[in-house]
């Protein structure tokens, strides 16, 4: 991917509040030009060999390939999940 190429980054978060917090920080630091927050989604996943269902929120961040690594690092640093879906 070329450094100036635009990309969308999909991030699940525990709730709308966490999504707003992350969105504000990444836009403030200019790691994303824009953030769209969907306040409620239903996630279905396999955890420890059991199917789990959980309410979450999702962020869609608009950024560039050049900013992606810094964006990902910041999200990992401030996200409440041990291994966030980015």
Name each model-derived stretch.
Residues 1-86:
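Positively charged, small/polar-rich N-terminal and surface patches that mediate targeting and assembly
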